């Protein structure tokens, strides 16, 4: 008798239906990497029927919605969540839409199943019968073949489909405009081809393409031999210097070409291959075409462009002085180079558009001395407050802080929070040793603040420079050393900078040598991104370093470091030379002045009255209110007050003959973050991705964001480009939305096509106040367009405001 092989005993159907059990994340629907083997694939897919259907119909448009021709606010309403039936080629809106035409199509009575559909934006395959997502790797080849065909067809037919959709919009628009006596405007929006999981890049670039101030300023520097006039500070008593700039760097040139090409909307979707390849040379982490984080991409891009521009300005200043060296330059030349360089590096277009400033104010409760730290930011990361029921605190813990909060309630207005009291136990338990050491380091930095210090922003010690940068730094160092004492050197060498790379993440190629830090980090927030390494940043984290009163040293700080950070790597045109630099080699982007004249009553004053939140409110204003609320530094977070320590030491010396050194005096303190310089373009980042213990999760709660945002309640009274009592208004013009889960999602953009603000453009390009800027432009409302890679759709304003925003782009209008 023949015995069967036990490995072949199971029927083939049972083998296919078996799939691994993987725990689901609470916010993720795509944790199963291997996918599902579906038994309906054989009967629910017809390649010939699909090819015939898509040739006869519009691409990525719900045919039923198109038949209904529904208009809202004069615009054709068409959803971007389109699913295609792989049996007959029917295209319908998804189950999350109002009409649910795709689901209705499946439920219609038929002899053959129409249960397998594919999303034409994210390319997710779904089976209604199995109620599961399918994978092309675990099913028959026909599934992979039809997906490949549809993706190729999408890149070819996107332009014609959009033009036919726009004709329907224009027909309706022309009818309405004839009745109103107006004209219909052409939309200056162009789709961007997806190179392979590059939706995170496309969404950001759509918003930058609608940043009109960026294109205006780039037009000034696009050509070689461009003249730049540098005005030194009045203290230097030097005449303005006109320098001739060389050609822009390769990434800057690629960015200019890309933004210029985005205006040519009649040519169809644009391939960003040239710009993306240039960025990958600077940041190799993007080479693998994996899903990345849009905020991180934005930081890398602006950081790299700014580095090229500052090097360009630096080289032009050295050329104006016949390229001096440390041996040939005299003291007078060094002083001039520093004076012109200090103002010259600030004239790059990235700083003029995107950079703002945060001021952290710390006040000792005992001696009432105040210290400030000024920190530049490229965006502000705002935590999203979730609706969770908090556990009741023990009476002992309640009473511990009640007296202080009650006694100080009448003295200081505004929301007061106690730092590091309600941290989840899970987060404490699973935090890495590096996170703990970083937290200890940050606390020590905060405690080292005192009233007698001026503190400024310090950056990475390992800086990459080319030949001109090294020569520039050498000139600065040789001059600074003449005025530095050995004590100053020892203090500066004791300063350490922060690394944003988590211990669990693996740095890529050239990034492993020097990790990311630099100016263009978020002003707060966990930089946790989906499908990428984790970059946890604590709220309001600042870097501190002591600054002496030497004017030469301050100038050296302003010019020495023209290489922002080591994130920009892989550039073969520059020498890779990383040196540990002391404080005189670090860039002081904005002049940080210690506020000695502040009284305790005025230390935390804002431009206007504090914003009043409502119950259960979740909006940009409430997030900003939470971000700028006052904190109490107490318990383990007490401030090491050097002024109190100094007074105690003095008292001991007067009352005792012993010369024993007094231990540091720790006191309760108040701390608050406020905006002290507002940028022309404000970028807000909503922290939707979090690490809870060992798991990752996404916060899907909707955050309300206004079309017009008043930033005055969150600005300090000493805000550099605003006055007390004035409004600081910003208009919304761009949104980056993330849909999906932590492990698999899709980035899209909402952009507002509008008339450029003439007053704002003149104000930003000329760097001076323009008469009439006090009054907001009386502009037209503009038109919102939803862009998903190459797919474009005109949407009503209400649709844009209902988006699950991840990044928000605001431009200043008042």
UniProtKB/Swiss-Prot annotation:
Active-site residues annotated for this sequence: 199 (nucleophile), 746 (proton acceptor)
Any one GO biological process: proteolysis
Chain residues that bind Zn(2+) 1: 38, 40, 127, 130
Top-level taxon of origin: Eukaryota
Modified residues (Phosphoserine): 28-29, 508, 526
Segments forming domain USP: 190-813
Binding site for Zn(2+) 3: 85, 88, 105, 114
Documented effect of changing residue 37 to A: Loss of protein expression
EC numbers on record: 3.4.19.12
Zn-finger (UBP-type) residues: 36-153
UniProt keyword annotation of Repeat present: no
GO MF entry, a single one: cysteine-type deubiquitinase activity
Keywords noted in UniProt: Cytoplasm, Disease variant, Hydrolase, Leber congenital amaurosis, Metal-binding, Nucleus, Phosphoprotein, Protease, Thiol protease, Ubl conjugation pathway, Zinc, Zinc-finger
Polar residues biased stretches: 515-527
Region (Disordered): 1-28, 418-443, 479-533
Tagged with keyword Phosphoprotein: yes
Family from the record: Belongs to the peptidase C19 family.
Full protein name: Ubiquitin carboxyl-terminal hydrolase 45
UniProt gene name: USP45
């Amino acid at each position: 008798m023949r015995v069967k092989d036990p490995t072949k005993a199971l029927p083939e159907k049972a083998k296919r239906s078996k799939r691994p059990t993987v725990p689901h994340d609470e916010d993720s629907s795509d944790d199963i990497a291997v996918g599902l083997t579906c038994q309906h694939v054989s009967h629910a897919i017809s390649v010939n029927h699909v090819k015939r259907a898509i040739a006869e119909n519009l691409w990525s448009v719900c045919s039923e919605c198109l038949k209904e021709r529904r208009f809202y606010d004069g615009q054709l309403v068409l959803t971007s969540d389109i699913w295609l039936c792989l049996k007959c080629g029917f295209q319908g809106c998804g189950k999350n839409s109002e009409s649910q035409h795709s689901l209705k199509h499946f439920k219609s009575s038929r002899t053959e199943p129409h249960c397998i559909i594919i999303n034409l934006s994210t390319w997710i395959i779904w089976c209604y019968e199995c109620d599961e997502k399918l994978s092309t790797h675990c099913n028959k080849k026909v599934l992979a073949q039809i997906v490949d065909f549809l993706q190729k067809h999408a890149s070819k037919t996107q332009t014609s489909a959009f033009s036919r959709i726009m004709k329907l919009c224009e027909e309706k628009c022309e009818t309405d405009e004839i009745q109103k006596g107006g004209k219909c405007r052409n939309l200056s929006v162009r789709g961007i081809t997806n190179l392979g999981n590059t939706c995170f890049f496309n969404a950001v670039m759509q918003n930058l393409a609608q940043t009109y101030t960026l294109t205006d300023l780039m037009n000034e520097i696009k050509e070689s031999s461009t003249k730049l006039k540098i005005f030194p500070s009045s203290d230097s008593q030097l005449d303005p210097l006109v320098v001739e700039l060389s050609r822009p760097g390769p990434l800057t040139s690629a960015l200019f070409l890309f933004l210029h090409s985005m205006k040519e909307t009649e040519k169809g979707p644009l391939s960003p291959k040239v710009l993306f390849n240039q960025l990958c040379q600077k940041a190799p982490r993007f080479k693998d075409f994996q899903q990345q984080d849009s905020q991180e991409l934005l930081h890398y891009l602006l950081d790299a462009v700014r580095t090229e521009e500052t090097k360009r300005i630096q080289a032009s200043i050295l050329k104006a002085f016949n390229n001096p060296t440390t041996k040939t330059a005299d003291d007078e030349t060094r002083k001039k180079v520093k004076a012109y360089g200090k103002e010259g590096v600030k004239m790059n277009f990235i700083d003029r558009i995107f950079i703002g400033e945060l001021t952290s104010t710390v006040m000792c409760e005992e001696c009432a001395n105040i210290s400030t730290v000024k920190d530049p930011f490229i965006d502000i990361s705002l935590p999203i407050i979730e609706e969770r029921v908090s556990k009741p605190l023990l009476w002992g813990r309640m009473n511990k802080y009640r007296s202080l909060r009650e006694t100080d309630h009448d003295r200081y207005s505004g929301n007061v929070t106690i730092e590091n009291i309600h941290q989840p136990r899970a987060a404490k338990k699973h935090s890495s040793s590096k996170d703990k050491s970083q937290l200890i380091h940050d606390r020590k930095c905060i405690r080292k603040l005192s009233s007698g210090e001026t503190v400024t922003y310090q950056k990475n010690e390992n800086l990459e420079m080319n030949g001109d940068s090294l020569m520039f730094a050498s000139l600065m160092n040789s001059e600074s050393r003449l005025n530095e004492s050995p004590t100053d050197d020892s203090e500066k060498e004791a300063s350490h900078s922060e690394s944003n790379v988590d211990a669990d993440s693996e740095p890529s190629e050239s990034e492993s040598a020097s990790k990311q830090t630099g100016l263009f980090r978020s002003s707060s927030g966990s930089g946790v991104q989906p499908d990428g390494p984790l970059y946890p940043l604590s709220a309001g984290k600042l870097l501190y370093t002591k600054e002496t009163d030497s004017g030469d040293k301050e100038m050296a700080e302003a010019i020495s470091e023209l290489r922002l950070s080591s994130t920009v790597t892989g550039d073969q045109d520059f020498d890779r030379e990383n040196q540990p630099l002391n404080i005189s080699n670090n860039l002081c982007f904005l002049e940080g002045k210690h506020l000695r004249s502040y009284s305790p009553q005025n230390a935390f004053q804002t431009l206007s009255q504090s914003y009043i939140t409502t119950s259960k409110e979740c909006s940009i204003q409430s997030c900003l209110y939470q971000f700028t609320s006052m904190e109490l530094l107490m318990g383990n977070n007490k401030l090491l007050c050097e002024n109190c320590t100094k007074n105690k030491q003095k008292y001991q010396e007067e009352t005792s003959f012993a010369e024993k050194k007094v231990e540091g005096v720790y006191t309760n303190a108040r701390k608050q973050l406020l905006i002290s310089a507002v940028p022309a373009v404000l970028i807000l980042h909503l922290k939707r991705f979090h690490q809870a213990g060992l798991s990752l999760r996404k916060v899907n709660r909707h955050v309300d964001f206004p079309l017009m945002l008043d930033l005055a309640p969150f600005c300090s009274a000493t805000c550099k480009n605003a006055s007390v009592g004035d409004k600081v208004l910003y208009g919304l013009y761009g949104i980056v939305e993330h849909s999906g889960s932590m492990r698999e999602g899709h980035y899209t953009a909402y952009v507002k096509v509008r008339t450029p603000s003439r007053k704002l453009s003149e104000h930003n390009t000329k760097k001076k106040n323009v008469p009439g800027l006090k009054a907001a432009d009386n502009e037209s409302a503009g038109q919102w367009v939803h862009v998903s890679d190459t797919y474009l759709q005109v949407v009503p304003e209400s649709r844009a405001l209902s988006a699950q925003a991840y990044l928000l782009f605001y431009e200043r209008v008042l």
